[in-house]
């Protein structure tokens, strides 16, 4: 690991039972698993792995672990092995039980609490191993420590094998194997990609740690070794791999005060949006917090000061925070004792002193960097000044949009057929491609809660456009006004007029293009819509099957064949009329209602954002200027395309 972290947060070499503190019992976990892991869906299933890996990361942060291996065995059994000191096996004074037993059977037991264990810990709630144990069909732990192998086994949280010495060893570390309990989870199949994303993130954030992910369900097994000596500098380069930097080097800033450490990596590219990713104790903080606030304030101050010093900025003609962040990619990682996470989803860092720490580091070290690298400083300042001029050019269009955003103004777009309901949580808006489909949708809808907005012509690709082109665009303007929440830094989800925003486009090239353009716009300028789960794509059926008065619709070739067989169950020779829907515009209002708009029958696909970094990269590839990465991406992913009318 880097020298910065080797000298910080090292506990005493002796990691024993005295450092394990017990706060409360484990009884409630199986009754209310969502309270401890968020949900029993896929995210909760994968959270089990993160909890065990976080224990190994804690050992790494303390300076005692360099290698972590995560394996998905057959039958979706998970194995996590590290070369840390090994969980203590001696008797824990508070309970009279071995520390190993306490860690796996008592909630909130671990070295994350109290003064003698880890000073910095990655676990958000610290629930850790005991919750994984409670929610597993079975769990087995082996500790290699002081020449012996200690083993315990559990079933749904209960001990089935007391701590036992099962052999001798010449290494140290902990190995945990567990099988998630199908009684607890909707699905127990692990996604290699989801685990890979999280583990790669951890490898970037902890420079020098080696994390190996293996999927033994594949034949041959799929393995990837992740180790990034450059840490978050490499993370920024990874994010920017399909973008064009305007200065060659990633800027790295770091510092510490007492037990708190901060490191920041920055690089500007020629894109028009910002990408700032922040972490506290290796936990992603998508809602930002004090570390981001300190970073943004200092960044704006330093760039303005450099502009004044070099006579590029004169008088009060300062650039704004929005200007200086155009095109920036930044990773901010802070590690601190007793991190306080705020907000409803606990995704915002609240420790006020971290703002001062990060502000001071950026103010001092970025100023120094600009002095030593005038070419990079000039390129960054020029980009901010260009953004400033574009922002000024966009101001009038922006004011026009702002004046017409509120419902009370009564100035809704001509293309909007609004609904009667005024409670946003009950309202939905269909964004419909073309006047023909919009006409059928308007006639077929339930006007009590369904609004229709027709889109026509070629939409603007916001990935290739600066803000001044977006605010006054005649295709985006009606959408911005209809939704009522503003865009960019001024977007306010509380003002959103509809909590279901449904893109309704054909399954052909043009429809897919419109969907992609809309999603690019939402991702870049209204991202909270996606983060809150308000954006959907309508899934119109491909086939209509008719037998006499009986009608059914199918969304795939497989479903068509299955329904056809079911409709002939009583008479194998019965005639089934199968017709293919050619497009939304060719459906009559009744067909459009019962296939695509009726809440009882329709199929909607919610647009989710599990991995913001990957999404950022994909939008850059698909919608950006560079053709070659797009060609490569299409070649790699073409095999996954089905049911596309060409």
Name each model feature, range by range.
Residues 31-50:
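Conserved short strand/loop->alpha-helix "switch" segment adjacent to the catalytic nucleotide/phosphoryl-transfer site
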Residues 86-91:
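A short glycine-centered beta->alpha linker in the GHKL/HATPase_c
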